[in-house]
């Protein structure tokens, strides 16, 4: 297996090209990382299912005050630390939590509230996450974690589920979140069906107060 360092939007990431299914960076999420970098200045950000912390690297580069990364895979989070170090980032502005989200809401809540929450789960993770039933469990907890005018970047890459899955379930589970836009995907990753490709959807909190619903 070969380890490489690549550059994207002026930032450096370690990737593995070889026998692993995942290289260490989802290249089709380039526009998503760019969007986060552009939004990040002065914000507290929660990065759920953080993997190797690509969103976190982009956020710190964009001037985020602090990023909390959560992922069950501690080896992936260790790679995330390496990615931050590659870019000479201050690790005092980054937290790494190697936990199961559904057993760690208290830890996540203590570090909030957040101005931006990124949700980018796997379609399936044996024993811990099934997208078509567990995404709803995440969505319903987002309002209690968000600042009053907070944003959510909700991502999904299951070809069997279109963007309406996220839009409709967000309306049910977190009605204070208004759908704003779907980010475009990079042209080097064309999809035979647009709805079957990567979905990165932006939502904005409305009518939310820090003590509950306004």
Identify the residue ranges that each predicted region occupies.
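Non-catalytic substrate-recognition/targeting regions of SAM-dependent transferases
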Residues: 1-26
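Conserved class I S-adenosyl-L-methionine
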Residues: 42-51
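Conserved SAM-binding loop of SAM-dependent methyltransferases across substrates and taxa
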Residues: 52-64
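Conserved SAM-binding motif I beta-strand of class I
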Residues: 66-71
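S-adenosyl-L-methionine
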Residues: 72-118
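A short glycine-rich, Lys/Arg-flanked "PGG" loop and its adjoining helix->strand segment in the class I
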Residues: 135-148
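Conserved beta-strand signature within the Rossmann-like core of class I S-adenosyl-L-methionine
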Residues: 149-156
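Class I S-adenosyl-L-methionine
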Residues: 167-214
């Amino acid at each position: 297996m070969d380890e490489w360092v690549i550059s994207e939007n002026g930032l450096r990431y370690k990737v593995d090209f070889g026998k692993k299914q995942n290289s260490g960076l989802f290249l089709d999420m380039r526009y998503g990382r760019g969007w986060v970098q552009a939004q990040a200045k002065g914000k507290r950000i929660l990065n759920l299912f953080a993997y190797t912390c690509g969103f976190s690297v982009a956020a710190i580069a964009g001037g985020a005050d602090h990023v909390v990364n959560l992922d069950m895979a501690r080896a992936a989070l260790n790679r995330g630390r390496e990615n931050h170090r590659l870019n000479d980032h201050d690790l005092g502005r980054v937290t790494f939590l190697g936990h199961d989200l559904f057993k760690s809401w208290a830890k996540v809540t203590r570090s909030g509230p957040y101005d931006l929450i990124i949700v980018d789960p796997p379609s399936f993770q044996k024993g811990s996450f099934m997208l078509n039933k567990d995404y709803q469990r995440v969505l319903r907890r987002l309002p209690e974690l968000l600042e009053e005018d907070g944003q959510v970047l909700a991502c999904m890459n299951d070809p069997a589920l279109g963007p309406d899955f996220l839009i409709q379930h967000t309306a049910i589970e977190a009605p204070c979140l208004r759908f704003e836009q779907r980010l475009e995907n990079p042209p080097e990753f064309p999809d035979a069906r647009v709805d079957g490709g990567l979905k990165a959807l932006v939502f904005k909190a409305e009518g939310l107060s820090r003590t509950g619903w306004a």
